[in-house]
Each structure stands twice: as structure tokens, then as C-alpha cells.
Design a protein with these regions (language model features):
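Cys/His-rich metal-chelating microdomains
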Residues: 15, 19, 23-26, 249, ...
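Radical SAM enzyme [4Fe-4S]-AdoMet core and its adjacent flexible, acidic
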Residues: 11, 32, 78, 98-99, ...
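Exposed loop/turn and edge beta-strand positions of beta-sandwich/beta-sheet ligand-binding modules
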Residues: 6, 50, 249, 265, ...
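Conserved alpha-helical substructure of the radical SAM core
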Residues: 1-103
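Flexible mid-to-C-terminal extensions adjoining Fe-S/redox cofactors in radical SAM and related proteins
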Residues: 243, 260-261, 265-332
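Conserved residues at the C-terminal ends of beta-strands
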Residues: 26, 55, 107, 175-178, ...
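Short loop/turn motifs at secondary-structure junctions
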Residues: 19, 48-49, 100, 139, ...
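Residue-level preference for beta-strand/loop junctions
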Residues: 4, 48, 139-141, 246-247, ...
Length: 332
């Protein structure tokens, strides 16, 4: 099985300065030391990761975040920092740029009212100011925005895009929308459902065409490949992949802050611990193999598009308790 050119997400801490309602952050209180993170990166070298996402918690909480970025850049050509941005100072930004950081991905979950509902009162305006600061160095580092779409903000997607792109001193290279994955806190009130997920896809189609001259609007939803089958197959061939769509355990893995390896940041099943095992051994874990071979159940298992879509394994796990089950929100 082919495992090179994966994207690696590593949670360098579970600590955070916010308490967002939809947060996936775990209760693991042990954070790897810098030496342990270096050990992890050394174990990943042979797999030649396409990109490394440094995440958390809030990674800027760590005093050694600049050193982590430096070590990441030795491993992969692309390093992305996932952050809420509120702890970012201009001096720290300069240090991160000097360390080789390629992208800063800032979380913004809709207009001010929706964002503050999720992340806390006053956080939207503070985040906007931080993005203006980042943009001062736009010739040295790229700004991404990551936005989680749920029931409370799906009707404001275009208004949000328009507002963000019209703010002076902010140049967004990529604006990525992510579907809300149910959790115990907001499962019943924010889950999109079939109609909501269909609306998300339709909104994306409109926004991508309408704002293509201003920014790149993307989404990680697997079902989009069904409507772009030819392109999906070309990507499989280009990167020598067994399948595309849901990237969990296929062309991406997640490493938690204690070294636990999971197929995805939102799929909380342990497949091993990279501090105690080598990655090749972990990738041969039975659960990883089942996902990679698309040994799916229900509607997803019978679907002719499972090699280019596969549904969302995290959604199946959160809703049905089985990561191989069908994605109940599929609108196809």
C-alpha cells in the first residue's frame, strides 16, 4: 500500500486560550516535549509528507513554537500553522516567517454574531485585527481562513465571504469551508443533515465562480468529487493514491499531543502511538487498512463512488458509532 505524500496534522498541545463550542480538542493533558516532536518528525522522514499542519489546542501557547516550525521545515516543503490568531504578536509572526512557516490558517466561523457565538464575545473583531497584521507580511507568508459551516451560519456564507474580502488590509489566499462534524455539545442543534450538506455544496459552487478572481474558495467535503469525477481520478493518478475523497488514513493522518495516531483529527480511534512504534507499523493497523481499502458499510459500501468519495468517516463515527458505517448526511 502507498503511504507517501501524506498530509500530517500534529497537535502540539491540548491547551487553548478559547473554549469553542464545536471544538474537537481532547482531554489528553500530556504534551510532547520538543525532543519528542523531533523524534516524531524523524520517524516521518521516509514517508516524505506533502505538508505538515501544526495544530492543537492553540499551538501559539507553546513557547517553543518557532523551534517546532524549524524542525517541521526539515521534514516537509510546506508547513501550516492552524491558529485562532489571538495570541499572535508581530514579533512572533516575524520569528515564524524567519523559521520558514509557509501558511497561517486562521479560524473564522462566519460573521461577527455567528463567530462570537462559537468562539466567545469579542473574538471576531480581535481576529480581524490579527489578520490585518499578518497581511502586512503577505509577500512572505500566505493567509488561509478556515470556516466551519453549521446550521447557525450556513445561510450567511456569501455575506461572510463578501465581508471578509472587502475588509481593507486583508488578502486571503484561500478561504476553506469545513462541514460541522457532530460532537456531544452541539450534535442536535448544529448538525447540517442531508439538506444542509446539499446546500453547503450548492453554496460552494456559486461562491467559487462568483469570487474566483479574488480568492480560492475550497472545501474538504468528499462528496464534491462525485460531481468532478474526472478531476478526482486525475489527482489519484498524479499522486499515486489508492483513493481520494475522505482523506482519513488515506492521504492524511493525525498525531495527537501525546503521540497517539488517529486517521483524522476528527476521528478519535487510536491506531497506535508514534512515540512507541514506527509509522509503518501503525499504518498496518487493522482499522487503518479497512479505511484505506474502503471496507465500508451501508450506502457508502455499495456506492460506486466510494473510491473518490467514501463519505466522512468522522461523521459516521460520531453519529453511528462506527467509522465504517455510511455517512447519514449524504445527499446523493
Amino acid at each position: 500500500m502507498k503511504y507517501k505524500n501524506m498530509n500530517i496534522t500534529i497537535d502540539v498541545t491540548s491547551k487553548c486560550n478559547l473554549r469553542c463550542k464545536h471544538c474537537r480538542v481532547n482531554e489528553i493533558r500530556y504534551d510532547m516535549t520538543l525532543d519528542e516532536i523531533e523524534k516524531v518528525f524523524n520517524k516521518l522522514t521516509d514517508f516524505k509528507p506533502r505538508g505538515v499542519f501544526i495544530s492543537g489546542g492553540e499551538p501559539l501557547i507553546r513557547d517553543d513554537i518557532v523551534e517546532i516550525v524549524k524542525k517541521s521545515k526539515k521534514l516537509s516543503p510546506v508547513t501550516i500553522l492552524n491558529t485562532n490568531s489571538l495570541l499572535l504578536t508581530e514579533n512572533k509572526l516575524k520569528e515564524l516567517i524567519d523559521a520558514g512557516l509557509d501558511y497561517i490558517q486562521v479560524s473564522v466561523d462566519g460573521l461577527e454574531e455567528q463567530h462570537d457565538y462559537i468562539r466567545g464575545k469579542g473574538t471576531y473583531r480581535k481576529t480581524i485585527e490579527k489578520m490585518k497584521m499578518i497581511n502586512k507580511y503577505s509577500n512572505q507568508i500566505k493567509l488561509h481562513i478556515s470556516s466551519v459551516v453549521s446550521k447557525s451560519n450556513i445561510d450567511y456564507m456569501e455575506k461572510f465571504v463578501k465581508e471578509i474580502l472587502e475588509i481593507e488590509k486583508i488578502n486571503v489566499q484561500i478561504l476553506g469551508f469545513k462541514r460541522f462534524i457532530p460532537n456531544n455539545v452541539l450534535k442536535d442543534v448544529e448538525t447540517l443533515g442531508k439538506n444542509g450538506l446539499k446546500k453547503l455544496y450548492q453554496n460552494l459552487e456559486v461562491l467559487q465562480k462568483r469570487y474566483k478572481e479574488k480568492t480560492i474558495i475550497t472545501s474538504d467535503m468528499p462528496m464534491k468529487n462525485i460531481f468532478n469525477e474526472k478531476q478526482a481520478i486525475e489527482i489519484m493518478k498524479k499522486y499515486n493514491l489508492d483513493c481520494v475523497g475522505c482523506s482519513a488514513g488515506v492521504n492524511g493522518i493525525s498525531i495527537r499531543n501525546d503521540g497517539t495516531v488517529t486517521p483524522c483529527t476528527l476521528l478519535y480511534i487510536s491506531c497506535g502511538n508514534i512515540l512507541k512504534q514506527n509509522l509503518k507499523e501503525i499504518l498496518q493497523n487493522a482499522d487503518m487498512i479497512k479505511i484505506k481499502k474502503r471496507e465500508l458499510k451501508g450506502k457508502c459500501g455499495k456506492c460506486k463512488y466510494k473510491k473518490i468519495c467514501g463519505g466522512c468517516r468522522a461523521a459516521a463515527y460520531q453519529i453511528l458509532g462506527d467509522f465504517l458505517e455510511e455517512d447519514l448526511e449524504c445527499f446523493i
